A protein has these predicted regions:
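C-terminal outer-membrane beta-barrel translocator/porin domains of Gram-negative envelope proteins
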Residues: 456, 475-480, 607-720, 727
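Classical Sec-dependent N-terminal signal peptides that target proteins to the secretory pathway
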Residues: 3-23
Length: 785
């Protein structure tokens, strides 16, 4: 049941579970010193498992015939003692043994490795070699470059581990043009060959994970040979192309570890040359043989992964069967790796889940406990003299850590569709000494542009290498909305990015299916290296229902069909500030209006200018940021003569960690002798029509006027990252004159609860307008525009 719960958790909430298994055959080195002499020249290379498969096969066969693995940890260590007696003639004196430590993968459970390091350090055990897979590679890597166990513990306690699995860009950092296209996306799937949707290669590209790892190892990323660290290190990853385990000892340590923890379906694979890396736990979750290749005589292994468990067939489902069957060989490989160990430790982590990163102290304590349970064996390995030599070596290496690197050139790798010239706008004009934040800024600017699944940097001598993985050019999108006014709405469409020379093209095509159907197509062309000048085009067709109109002795609904074709020039003054000027042609056809004089079709050209500034962290119930837009439209033609102005602004002010205070004002007005229905101001309900203002407690569109002003104050209490409660007071002034502030007044009081989900926002509340009945509010999904 625990495996089932973990699988469901990560499928629906995009969290991480490390399967921690392998499917490659292991090798027992019965006489490691003799055998390793044959491959000593390979110890500083990236070594595939096939490179060591043929080493002393006769020893392997003899061993497997004579020995079998029992599951109890105690028996494993007893057999290790027996093995040492049998090979006594080849035994190296205890004080001269070179000790290696292998740390397995296991996501949050891998934090138990820190507790074991603390005990080994206290007892002055001179660990000269460390290997790791997945989470184990992070801990092993930190230990190898010179972090002390105490420092690693402090980092683990203060680090936001779940951030590794979230590549989400803050909305304000995307920029206004991306937000115009992407704001209401719920489900986005890339299009493959023949325009067929396909699943992405991973839930996250791994950009944040790479950035966090570069931060941890920044001082040492200039050293590209891991055997030159104070403790020789190797990370283990799986080559997806060949299915082989790969021992990585060269390159960027941050990239090597990122490859080792690339959980299939969670992280996108990492490409390095001809190899495509995924999590090393798929083939070798406990990298013991890699210690022997590095040169270890005595091996300690710490396993925090799962093993074989007895299944109840009545409680199994399809996911359980698929998961278990695909990892059988992997679990067998872990057991084969255990046979190579001299000391095996498996902390008791049954009460912890793979995603329990909030229980850092408890998990570390579990690791410390298993080490103290084996304290007698650990003390036999104590060698204060050699330990002090290693400690001095560690301190000397730490002195070489640097805050800056002298960069003389910048290369882009991984780009195919986007040529090198495309990246010039993101790169500094002058090179020289660069620190981590400056390198991260370059990567962030490239990634925030939205054309790459991941981006990360490496330092190779004096060269800064920016690695990118390009996104597909086209996507299919899907979202929907359910509310108590327009009922159900489904939106589907296409989005994408294209490059035409120096022109970056973003496009969007959406279709709305409901009682109020419509089609919207938008294109944004970025001109020049900095894309400060934009050509914008928009085609819009929609069928709006205008509700609750008073005529004669009752209320009725009618239809306004709008068609608009518009183009213009935009100037991106800053990342979140856009000035637009343009014009187009529009039709407005009114049907079923009880006032027969207003039925009919108007055709007219129009001109429009707008200014928009937007730094909100969300378009629905933001907790911080500013939003302002002002749009002026006019027409002077046979069918239409009007001037219209729409303005709105809000400031979302955080008050402490939980509260957000939001004052907001909106003004909508029109004046002219012949005003199309599209530009007639309306007030009430949830805003879904053109030229309407939201006002809870009133039926949709019930109040009309030539000028409407609404002011409101909202207090939002954020219960968690996804849940909140809010209360709002609003006041409206209505006038029958254009560009006026009227004397007719309406007030609204609202209280409700909201939720933010991957599929869109949800809200339920109640609202009261004096003189109206108490009304409820129900909305799920982005509101149709």
């Amino acid at each position: 049941m625990k495996r089932k719960n973990m699988i469901y958790f990560f499928i629906f909430f995009i969290f991480l579970i490390n399967l921690s298994f392998s499917d490659e055959k292991g090798i027992f080195l019965e006489n490691p010193k003799e055998n390793l002499e044959k491959i000593s020249d390979e110890s500083e290379k990236n070594i595939d498992i096939k490179d060591v498969k043929n080493i002393r096969k006769d020893n392997l066969e003899k061993f497997e015939k004579k020995n079998f693995l029992k599951k109890e940890d105690k028996n494993i260590n007893e057999r290790s003692e027996s093995k040492k007696s049998e090979n006594k003639k080849n035994e190296i004196p205890q004080k001269d043994k070179k000790i290696g430590l292998a740390l397995s993968g296991g996501t949050a459970k891998g934090l138990a490795h820190i507790g074991i390091l603390k005990v080994l350090d206290e007892e002055k055990v001179p660990v000269e070699f460390v290997t790791g897979t997945s989470m184990g590679s992070i801990i092993a890597g930190m230990y190898s470059v010179g972090y002390t166990p105490k420092e690693i513990e402090e980092i683990a306690e203060n680090m936001d581990w779940m951030k590794l699995f979230n590549d989400k860009i803050e909305r304000r950092n995307k920029g206004i043009t991306r937000n115009m296209i992407e704001d209401q996306n719920s489900i986005v799937l890339p299009l493959g060959k023949k325009a067929m949707p396909k699943l992405p290669v991973g839930v996250v590209g791994g950009k944040t994970a790479s950035q966090q790892l570069n931060e941890l190892f920044y001082g040492a990323i200039g050293t590209d040979d891991f055997t030159k660290f104070p403790r020789k290190f190797a990370a283990v990853a799986t080559d997806l192309n060949s299915g082989e385990g790969v021992m990585i000892t060269k390159g960027s340590i941050a990239t090597a570890i990122r490859a080792s923890l690339s959980l299939p379906s969670i992280f996108a694979p990492v490409r390095s040359g001809d190899r495509l890396y995924i999590d090393g736990g798929v083939v070798r979750n406990l990298p013991v043989q890699d210690l022997k290749v590095l040169g270890a005589d005595y091996t300690i292994g710490v396993n925090v992964g799962d093993g074989f468990v007895k299944r109840d067939e009545n409680k199994m489902n399809l996911i359980d069967v698929i998961t278990d069957s695909s990892t059988i060989a992997g679990r067998q490989e872990v057991e084969r790796q255990i046979r190579m160990l001299d000391l095996y430790m498996k902390p008791d982590l049954e009460k912890f889940e793979a995603y329990d990163f909030s229980k850092v102290k408890e998990i570390i304590a579990a690791g410390e406990k298993i080490a103290r349970d084996n304290i007698d064996k650990i003390r036999e390995l104590s060698n204060p003299k050699l330990y002090d030599e290693l400690e001095e070596k560690r301190k000397e290496f730490r002195k070489t850590w640097t805050d800056e690197y002298n960069i003389t050139s910048i290369d882009i790798e991984g780009n195919k569709k986007y040529k090198d010239s495309y990246f010039k706008k993101f790169l500094p004009k002058k090179l020289g000494n660069m620190n981590r934040l400056e390198m991260e800024e370059i990567v962030n600017e490239i990634y925030q542009n939205g054309n790459f699944t991941t981006a990360y940097y490496e330092v190779k001598n004096n060269k800064l290498v920016i690695n990118v993985q390009e996104k597909p050019s086209d996507y299919v999108t899907l979202n929907g909305n359910i509310n108590n006014e327009d009922k159900a709405t489904i939106n589907f469409g296409f989005q994408g990015n294209k490059v035409l020379g120096d022109i970056n093209v973003r496009y969007s095509s959406n279709t709305t299916v409901s009682n109020e159907y419509g089609i919207n197509n938008s294109v944004i062309l970025g001109i020049g290296k900095d894309e400060k000048v934009l050509i914008l085009g928009n085609l819009d067709y929609k069928r709006d229902m205008i509700y609750n109109q008073n005529f004669g002795n009752g209320y009725y609904d009618f239809v306004n069909k709008k068609f608009s074709l518009e183009t213009g020039v935009g100037f991106q003054i800053s990342k979140n500030l856009l000035l637009f000027a343009g014009g187009g042609y529009q039709t407005s056809k009114v049907e079923k209006n009880q006032d027969q004089r207003k039925n009919g079709k108007k055709r007219f050209p129009f001109f429009e200018t707008s200014l928009t500034y937007d730094t909100r962290n969300s378009i629905e119930s933001p907790t911080k940021g500013i939003y302002f837009t002002s749009k002026y439209t006019f027409s002077n033609s046979k069918d239409a003569n009007f001037n219209a102005l729409y303005q709105t602004g809000e400031v979302n002010i955080p008050v402490g960690e939980k509260l957000t205070f939001t004052p907001k004002v909106s003004y909508l007005t029109v004046k002219g002798s012949d005003i199309p229905e599209t530009y007639e101001p309306k007030l009430g309900g949830i805003k879904t029509e053109d030229n309407s203002l939201e006002f809870f407690g009133l039926p949709a569109d019930k109040v009309r006027g030539e000028s409407i002003f609404v002011g409101s104050v909202k207090l939002q209490y954020n219960i968690s990252k996804i849940l909140y409660a809010d209360t709002m007071y609003s006041r409206a002034y209505i006038s029958d004159e254009g560009f006026d502030f009227g004397s007719r007044k309406r007030e609204s009081y609202k209280l409700g609860f909201g939720v933010k989900t991957p599929l869109g926002p949800g809200y339920f509340g109640i609202a009261k307008v004096p003189g109206e009945t108490l009304r409820y509010i129900l909305n799920f999904g982005y509101k149709p525009q």
